[in-house]
Amino acid sequence: MSGVNEIRSTFLDYFRKEGHEVVASSPLVPRNDPTLMFTNAGMVQFKNVFTGLEKRSYSRATTAQKSVRAGGKHNDLDNVGYTARHLTFFEMLGNFSFGDYFKERAIELAWNLITKEFGLKKDKLLVTVYHTDDEAAGFWKKIAGFSDDRIIRIATSDNFWAMGDTGPCGPCSEIFIDRGEHVWGGPPGSPEEDGDRFLEFWNLVFMQYEQVTKEERIDLPRPSIDTGMGLERMASILQGVESVFETDLFRHLIDAASSALGRAPDAETVASYRVIADHLRSSSFLVADGVLPSNEGRGYVLRRIMRRAMRHAQLLGANEPLMWKLVPALVREMGQAYPELLRGEQLVTETLKLEETRFRKTLVRGLGLLSEATETLHAGDMLDGETAFKLYDTYGFPLDLTQDALRQRNISVDLAGFTNAMEQQKAEARKHWTGSGEAATETVWFSVREQTGATEFLGYETEQAEGLIQALVKDGKTVDSAGKGDAVAVVVNQTPFYGESGGQMGDTGIISGEGFSIEISDTQKKADGLFVHLGKVASGTVKTGAAVELKVDHARRTRLRANHSATHLIHEALREVLGTHVAQKGSLVAPERLRFDISHNKPISAEELEEVERMANEIVVQNSPVTTRLMSVDDAIAEGAMALFGEKYGDEVRVVSMGTGLHGAKANRPYSVELCGGTHVRATGDIGLVRVVSDSAVAAGVRRIEALTGEAARKHLDEQDRRLKAAAATLKISPADVPARVEALLEERKKLEKDLTEARKKLALGGGAAAGAPSENETVAGVGFLGKAVSGVSPKDLKPLADAGKSSLGSGVVVFVGADEDNKASVVVAVTDDLVGRFSAVDLVRVASAALGGQGGGGRPDMAQAGGPDASKANDAIAAVKAALEAA
């Protein structure tokens, strides 16, 4: 029993038999400890159990915990490959007691495992205890039979563990093995303790106190146990090798790399092979746990790890991407213990291949430039910081790779000069920001961004997380605190809240901490990756540096996800129905509805909208998974992904795919593939239902589509159904007969309106004049004259009426004045052809308009029309025309 997988199983099985719950490893991205970049110990997932904030169904647990130490204060990255024991990824085996057994039982369990199960020799072992922990020393004597010289008392913090400035804490006891005189080093506490002869492999933490203040420490009512054993170190001990890289798991990974390169490791290349093997593990597990390479936060640390491995692959002669080819070997070694590695194998492979393909150009160019910049330098010299910064800023060559490349030549880098060059660039960027026309209040976010860095977004995987408040902004200025009722903007180191972008509205919810809560009404993105939570302090006083819990409004986020995913389906359906010229010109994804604007130069017919809706719902009922991948822009577009108008994309993009096409060229292919950074449903069925409710024009060649999903769509259909049933009840018919009945009524109305128009025409021509107006045709100034005020005749029907009047007169002048519901008048004057030489209809209609309180009018000499605000002056208008005829 000495293989890594066998050692892990033996450890977990041993503690299972001893009444411990075997708990799966938590993800590498901690959800309940915002102070950590990555999970780096087994106790991280039990933090709230130890502090009493969380209850579990068990009081004893054991785990094999995935851990990463790279970035932040826990950073082994630069040492990996050059020492026998440093790793960025390692497995921490541990057993835990939550107020169950304590010091004596913990020591007994550990001793029995390492001597009886693992078979370690007592005379090779020794332990350390905290210098005042006589109790632990006594138990080691009792259980292991150690003499005082095998129990070393340590007075430093190495043997006293604390969760923080306050909280649970207690002494430690570490177990060491003596690897023999052939290895340099001394026992713990000696001047030579940093050597490798005495190797610590298990740390037992006895949580028996609570640090109340800096000065006050009290006993815990229920002391607990937290232990951690490095699996890789234990494997090196049991397999009798000097380095963790010589254990079976690492040998297999190094063999896979050697086979792919066609080159066996030797003294000159062994460090590079070790770097590749270790970094393959950390990169793969981080990607499998949802971290993707980026230029900020965890993603940046992942990118550094990947690129450091890729640099060493290049040193070994790799002329094409190597890392992705090694993923199957890693899955064979560790996939059974960690199923998430199996599930994420494709994503891990694609991510590694993409990153290495993109980075090779940077690497080759950067190494060439570095060679030129250092051709006059020798061992012991220093590369100036300005040149190192230029390599980083202009050519994308990271500082740590510059240092790593020069390390082999014993050349250092002027880090102070590098930092100074970076600060100068920031000052220039800030000056440019201030002069860019942004509102003065917006510049505060640039300052905050400089101090805090970008916000880590967790919202693709979770709607709840913990964080630390890094900045508070009130009235456009940073403040240290804000009280109840204050409107405040909050910046946290990591957040599940989505910041408004890509048309999707920002999240709302609650941010709370000890003694305070903030109601978040919006989340926005500011200043290059800074997420700003806008809200009002609902209770207490909030201060910068406070630990907080962030909870997104789940119901609202659910509706936003459904609406955003529906825009993708509708967009693709529109392209299929209307043509590939359709492109999105803008969008709004709100919780209540969605709308987006598309390029299309004519109204969309009802039949076309019905087909769009049908096709979108066809994908909804598939309930197919919605997948996301990280790709280069060029690769994404080459695969058919749609890039949206007006959006800015970085070198890497998130590609969202959903549905399977059923018809034509899309058959059996992904239905919708778009570049998108928004939040989406897990499966298309989560959308529920898509209902297109309107199509309108917003600009030349641009149509606006509005739609509803899920419950909103169902309510819309319910309301339409209620209205249909109400109409049917009014008509005293069944709902199915309503369309035919309405069509018949419309035809009947059309006929009645036509009959009414004819009746009004006859009435106007045959009599019924208003009081004071002539009832028969007259002669004025020697010509025939017909003038009447008519009601119920629309302005557009006055001209046909005037034509009929001319025909009735044969020769003469006709005037008709109509009125609308607002008592505004319309007037038409017509002159028969034989009289247009004497009278102009345009001149006469202007006279009539003036009498009605209007002015102007226009038309032809034989027919003109005008209006006026006062229809009660209709008879005055007719009289004015008669007077004009007499005066002519």
Swiss-Prot record:
Keywords, comma-separated and alphabetical: Aminoacyl-tRNA synthetase, ATP-binding, Cytoplasm, Ligase, Metal-binding, Nucleotide-binding, Protein biosynthesis, RNA-binding, tRNA-binding, Zinc
GO MF annotations, alphabetized: alanine-tRNA ligase activity; aminoacyl-tRNA deacylase activity; ATP binding; tRNA binding; zinc ion binding
Requisite cofactors: Zn(2+)
GO cellular component, one term: cytosol
Catalytic activity entry: tRNA(Ala) + L-alanine + ATP = L-alanyl-tRNA(Ala) + AMP + diphosphate
Pfam families from the UniProt entry: DHHA1, tRNA-synt_2c, tRNA_SAD
Gene3D superfamilies associated with the record: 2.40.30.130, 3.10.310.40, 3.30.54.20, 6.10.250.550, Bira Bifunctional Protein, Domain 2, Threonyl-trna Synthetase, Chain A, domain 2
Residues that coordinate or bind Zn(2+): H564, H568, C676, H680
GO BP annotation list: alanyl-tRNA aminoacylation; negative regulation of DNA-templated transcription
CDD domains xref list: AlaRS_core
Subcellular localization: Cytoplasm
PANTHER family in the cross-refs: ALANINE--TRNA LIGASE, CYTOPLASMIC (PTHR11777:SF9), ALANYL-TRNA SYNTHETASE (PTHR11777)
The record's note on its domains: Consists of three domains; the N-terminal catalytic domain, the editing domain and the C-terminal C-Ala domain. The editing domain removes incorrectly charged amino acids, while the C-Ala domain, along with tRNA(Ala), serves as a bridge to cooperatively bring together the editing and aminoacylation centers thus stimulating deacylation of misacylated tRNAs.
Family (UniProt): Belongs to the class-II aminoacyl-tRNA synthetase family.
Protein name listed in UniProt: Alanine--tRNA ligase
Organism whose genome encodes this protein: Mesorhizobium japonicum (strain LMG 29417 / CECT 9101 / MAFF 303099) (Mesorhizobium loti (strain MAFF 303099))
Upper taxonomic lineage: Bacteria, Pseudomonadati, Pseudomonadota, Alphaproteobacteria, Hyphomicrobiales
Gene behind the chain: alaS
